[in-house]
Amino acid sequence: MNLERYTEQARQAIAQSQVLARESAHSKIDLPHLAAVMLRDAAGLPAKIVQKAGQNPQNIYQAAQSELGRLPKVSGTEGGQYLSSRLASALGRAEKLADELKDRFVALDTLLLALAETGYGGLQASAVRQALQEIRGGRTVNSEHAEGTYNALEQYGLDLTRQAEEGKLDPVIGRDEEIRRVIQILLRRTKNNPVLIGEPGVGKTAVVEGLAQRIVKGDVPEGLKGKRIVSLQMGSLLAGAKYRGEFEERLKAVIQETVQSAGQIILFIDEIHTVVGAGKAEGAVDAGNMLKPALARGELHLIGATTLDEYREIEKDPALERRFQPVFVDEPSLEETVSILRGIKEKYEVHHGVRISDPALIAAAQLSHRYIADRKLPDKAIDLVDEAAARLRMALESSPESIDALNRRKLQLEIEREALKKETDAESKFRLGELEKEIADLEEEIRKQQAEWEAEREIMQKLRAAQQRLDEVRTQIEQAERAYDLNKAAPLRYGELPKLEQEVNELADRMAGAQFVRPMVTEEDIAAIVSRWTGIPVAKLMEGEREKLLRLEDELHKRVVGQDEAIVAVADAIRRARAGLKDPNRPIGSFLFLGPTGVGKTELAKTLAASLFDTEENMVRIDMSEYQEKHTVARLIGAPPGYVGYEEGGQLTEAVRRRPYSVILFDEIEKAHPDVFNVLLQVLDDGRLTDGQGRTVDFRNTVIILTSNIGSPLIFEGIQSGQSYETIRERVFGVLQQHFRPEFLNRLDEIVVFRPLAREQIAAIVQIQLEAVRKRLAERRITLELSQEALDFLAQRGYDPVFGARPLKRVIQRELETPLSRKILAGEVADGAHLYVGSGPLGLTFEARPTAVA
């Protein structure tokens, strides 16, 4: 026996037989070892041949295993060192069969045929030989990896026309122009290879699926009728090709099978750019070069699909590119997207077992178009519908909230009951009796609601089963009508179909009044998914949120004292956005806050972020003092190609891509280089910015706040000379126009000059600052009370019209926090104490009281 004459898979089978004999402690390798190894994999080549020969491979495998269990075991010496005479004779016969079949190597299927000729396991040699020849398709074994080339299209391809016949493809709505153009190119004599080019998610693969469905229906010109579209899986072709030349052999077999079909098979390669360089190794030929000759001669019909960016890979090889005809697939319009969603709705309803309302489909198209900027229609709209239906299905299959709440209440009462059982006093016994009654009432209510929910769920499951059956019947009708089998089609179309449609409608009507199960996907469900994906609140306003928006000024005034103009301007912009009246192509609002230091410009931005998002974390703060040089603009939008940090993206663009709904604060903008403002022009006007990598970032759901100290000297001058606020404002605007370009100022929604703080406002700020001190003391359970004199002392010491509220912070630190920290460290103020702060001739006085005064 010359092992070099065997293919790689045949050698592996013999080696594994030896391993099996050794593990089983059998002295010889025999026919059952080889049979068990060959038929172990139900999807392997030997199992397929046995099945094609009309026998069950699993039965033969089980018989081989039982025979192995009966063979005598040896001990003391290592097993599997000899071939049995039966196996040696079978291997000799396999080599002779290879010569008869004109093979250069003994393949795995030849071994199986030799096994069949011994009569092992009841295998019929003639049937196995016929199956072998069918699978080989007239080819001979000329390489060590020949098995990988048998039935290459079946192994490495997916028949889209067969899937269309079985109703496994989603309906393709629209795209008629693209499908017609593909058909036109396929009917050419040479270079009849269309390549679909478009952005990810616009429906390139759907065009090919639409063509497969048209071929099945016969809705194509004569030249395409009866043809098969096979999608080639490049991953399967490459997977497991360990040895040089194995990948090329597989691809060659695919090309040969396609060419031999005499134009009956059209290959479809999704992500066709992967064939350029696929399988390339030193001295090897890549897939693209192997396809060229057959493509040029028109023997190979090929449809490709790739994105605009990745088509460049093919453009690098002009000889390959000229063999393709590009077909551009554009993003569908909103109306077309809604039509597509209506067409595929039924498939999703059947899969999830829920109904999808038409307004939900319209909302999915509109909201995805408006809020999900980095993806394309119809893909993003379909994803929204799919996820909303999955979310509803998950809710339907879990216990309703009302039953959960009752169960939690019952558990709480049961814990209380167990505690009261140990008490003996009359009051506890009375309470125990009340508890028993309440628990019994709860159990009754839970039982009642549980029964209702179970009944509704049962109807829901019946509805899902009926929808699935309806879908199956429609597919069967289509198949019967295509085959002109009217005896089968008529009873289905006029008997079973109307009956099932009526059943589905009746069950849907019964579900309409359901208390616990809501089987309909609505606009609110779609809006909730959009909010979860993007963080943008697009759901309908709840009553609480309406109140909050109407009282937004009061919320902002809690932390920002005075500055009514600025607060009203910001609050109005937020209300316009949430009511849906803002310009859809601009940010929610863009404001320039001017004024002296310490009057609340930055604090207002922080407060707005906290009231919109319940946390200041959602504020993107960019300190413009870091952007004083021209080249620092690249830090905002990302470095250009070829520079360090190109992959990282910009500080501004990346922050907004991750959180499209946020407050962006550009602090101290007058300190930045003038070129930075050129970047902001597009953001303020169109609500978009292109980063260093060419991606468009959407700023339409951001609030942009810029702060500046420009004109501060004029404000100080005006305050000291007693000028009115209006006069100061006019003078500040004059300075502003000298510093910033008109096109920048013209794009801002509002320019607000903050007023200097008055003495009364400082008194209100004292209370806000003290609240922060109280929060820090709360960790030690120390409460703080200040007399009116102490408050007046802090306000008077902290008032400085030129420096705003910041000196007040320093006064509180010096006069209150520092002496207080000394007293805590000295042990004069214990944890849990109540501290009373008064005012004396030398400053603040501290008196620790043991308990808090009510």
From Swiss-Prot:
GO-annotated molecular function: ATP binding; ATP hydrolysis activity
Xref: PANTHER family: ATP-DEPENDENT CLP PROTEASE, HEAT SHOCK PROTEIN 104
Protein name: Chaperone protein ClpB
Coiled coil: 382-513
Gene behind the chain: clpB
Chain residue ranges for the region called NBD2: 545-756
Reported function: Part of a stress-induced multi-chaperone system, it is involved in the recovery of the cell from heat-induced damage, in cooperation with DnaK, DnaJ and GrpE. Acts before DnaK, in the processing of protein aggregates. Protein binding stimulates the ATPase activity; ATP hydrolysis unfolds the denatured protein aggregates, which probably helps expose new hydrophobic binding sites on the surface of ClpB-bound aggregates, contributing to the solubilization and refolding of denatured protein aggregates by DnaK.
Lineage per the UniProt record: Bacteria, Thermotogati, Deinococcota, Deinococci, Thermales
Positions that bind ATP 1: G198, E199, P200, G201, V202, G203, K204, T205
Keywords: ATP-binding, Chaperone, Coiled coil, Cytoplasm, Nucleotide-binding, Repeat, Stress response
